[in-house]
C-alpha cells in the first residue's frame, strides 16, 4: 500500500534509483495505491548519465508492494520491497529493461510492454 511520501525502489534502467510519491492518481481524495496503480513521483536518487535526473517529477506504475494483493482464487502475492517503473504518458516504460519480478495484475491494467520486458511475471 503506497501513499503520499512513500519511497519506492525503481525497477528499470531509466536512471532513477529511488522515487518519493507525491500523489496517487485515480480519483479525488484517493489515499493509497497498490500494484498496477499510477502515481506521481519525484526522483530522490539517480545514476549519473541516466535519462531521468534527480529532482525530476515523473509518473510511475507500482509493480511490487510489501503489502501484496489478493487474487480471485484467494491466494496472496507479496514481495520483499516496494518498487515502481517510470512510465511515459502512453503507459510505456521510459527505460529499456525491467529488473526483478512483476505481478500478473499489470497485464489486466494494460501495461503489456512492462509485462513483456519483465524477466518474471508472478
From Swiss-Prot:
Matching SUPFAM superfamilies: Ribosomal protein L14
Pfam families xrefs: Ribosomal_L14
A GO cellular component annotation in the UniProt record: cytosolic large ribosomal subunit
GO terms assigned for molecular function: large ribosomal subunit rRNA binding; structural constituent of ribosome
Record keywords, A-Z: Ribonucleoprotein, Ribosomal protein, RNA-binding, rRNA-binding
Matches recorded under InterPro entries: Ribosomal_uL14, Ribosomal_uL14_bac-type, Ribosomal_uL14_CS, Ribosomal_uL14_sf
An individual GO BP term: translation
Coiled-coil residue windows: none
Assembly mode: Part of the 50S ribosomal subunit. Forms a cluster with proteins L3 and L19. In the 70S ribosome, L14 and L19 interact and together make contacts with the 16S rRNA in bridges B5 and B8.
Entry similarity comment: Belongs to the universal ribosomal protein uL14 family.
Role of this protein: Binds to 23S rRNA. Forms part of two intersubunit bridges in the 70S ribosome.
Protein's name in the database: Large ribosomal subunit protein uL14
Organism: Exiguobacterium sibiricum (strain DSM 17290 / CCUG 55495 / CIP 109462 / JCM 13490 / 255-15)
